[in-house]
Amino acid sequence: MIRNLTKLTKFTIGNRFYQSSSKGRFSGKNGNNAFKSIVGVSVGVSALFAGCVFLDQEKEPESTPSIDVKEKKSQPPKTKEDYQKKMDEEYDIEQFKYVIIGGGTAAYHAIDKILENDKEATILLISKEYEVPYQRPPLTKSLWATKDDNVVNTLNFSDWSGKKQNLLYEQESAYGNEILQFIRTKKVIDLHIDEKLVLLNDGKLIRYDKCLIATGGEPRQLKFTSTNDKKISTYRTVEDFRKLYEVVKDGGKHVTVLGGGFLGSELTCAINSNFQDKNIKIDQIFPESGVLSTLFPDYLSKYATEEIIKSGVNVHTGTLIKDVVDNSENGRLTVTLNNGKTFETDHVVVAAGIIPNTNVVKSTTLEIDPINGGYVVNPELQARTDLYVAGDVASYYDFSLGVRRRVEHHDHARATGEMAGSNMSTKDTPAPYTYQPFFWSDLTPGVGFEAVGNTSSKLKTFSVWEKPSSDETKQSYTKGNIYYLNDNNNVVGVLCYGNYGKMDTARDLILKRRTIEDLNQLQHAIDFDEHH
């Protein structure tokens, strides 16, 4: 057990990632956070489990049993505390005040809040990945623009202002001390909520006082005749970035990207814009009529697709991949489309979205949202007493929109992580999650936006462009605002296309829930002035 924890000094968290403008959306790591307070804290009296702070496990055991908390036969304990103490001793159970399952953005920001609020905290972070927590947006954006082949090792990049950043929120020196410990490359395969026990895939049991599930999602897989995982991959982690970068860095390759959503489109455009001079060719394939079709109105989806084609990408709309097979003659892959066409490629990236990872609880039933997926939580982000959920895997009720949602964007992961961490560690009444997260994307120089709320293309939309034209064929899509309305004519979502820094105004418009009697009321709801 860990004893005599070093006290942390009080700090004030900055407004990381609360900026509404894309020009501030990656301000980097705030130098004034709780992690800085624990860097340099010496490793404690007893190291984690097998005598080391960082534990690696690449292979799962052959059997992964569910949790069995039956007590060995002996003198029965008199109290629950006696029972737990006896059980912990007999089964060699390590105990932490806070256990965080998942090593992403939500987990990082939850830990930051816990360290701020609880000076007596002992925290265990469990991640299936090797890396300590890192930012995901640069994986499809800034990392590709570094022009430095050593980026796969340094993970350094420049933000919008030219400031140097690192993909990792904090370096490894912030982890592995008396206060915060980290288990890498291991999975939680079960939770026993009543006993507050976590079971790892090596059979190790860990007891918690409070636990956060922030497991994110798993990439959707597609089955092909070829099973060559060196040439067919999904794209979700920093390791995926490293592998794909190695494919394209020397040039002269052909890459095929499956998917026309955020991931597929951002990855396609990032590689294309930064490696065209190295003769990298890209085909993007998806079944919809245009990119981001679940977000953009049809006309804008088609326009964005045309812009991507103009940038040099070979885009296949309304198309599915029928199969991918190995070509034994030249070592490449042969792609067959559902329209009968075939072509050869060097690498296939499956970017078909994610499935929320709800596989960490087996012996206890947690409610899963049957429509959106993810664990159902209350307004305070609790799934059960002392068990919280944040990030992509949380299904929560959005009071502003009046619907239950599950959101897969960075700002939401940050905000729910902070809220869950705060509620887990506060001495005050836990607060409800009412924040309206925003998201952004930049595909080509002519396709970039920020958005907030429910921006489903299935909703009614009303578009206001800075330079409107009566001739649709001559319309300039440089700067505009798109409003999404529900059946009651309430604005429930706003997308600001090329019009940055307007998210606070957009949030206010959504929160008012005002019925729009005349759509022309929205003509001047959000201005086109520059706010960077």
Curated annotation (Swiss-Prot):
It comes from the Eukaryota. NAD(+) 1 binds at G260, G261, F262, L263, E288, G353, E408, H409, W440. Coiled coil: none annotated. NAD(+) 2 binds at W160, E450. One of its GO terms (biological process) is reactive oxygen species metabolic process. One of its GO terms (cellular component) is cytoplasm. GO terms for molecular function: DNA binding; FAD binding; NAD(P)H oxidase H2O2-forming activity; NADH dehydrogenase activity; oxidoreductase activity, acting on NAD(P)H; protein dimerization activity. Its main location: mitochondrion. FAD binds at residues 102-106, 128-129, 136, 141, 188, 236, 392, 409-410, 440. It is found in: Mitochondrion; Cytoplasm; Nucleus. It is an enzyme of class 1 (oxidoreductase). It catalyses: A + NADH + H(+) = AH2 + NAD(+). Disulfide bonds: none annotated. Probable NADH oxidoreductase that acts as a caspase-independent mitochondrial effector of apoptotic cell death. Belongs to the FAD-dependent oxidoreductase family. This is Apoptosis-inducing factor 1, mitochondrial. It comes from Dictyostelium discoideum. The gene is aif.
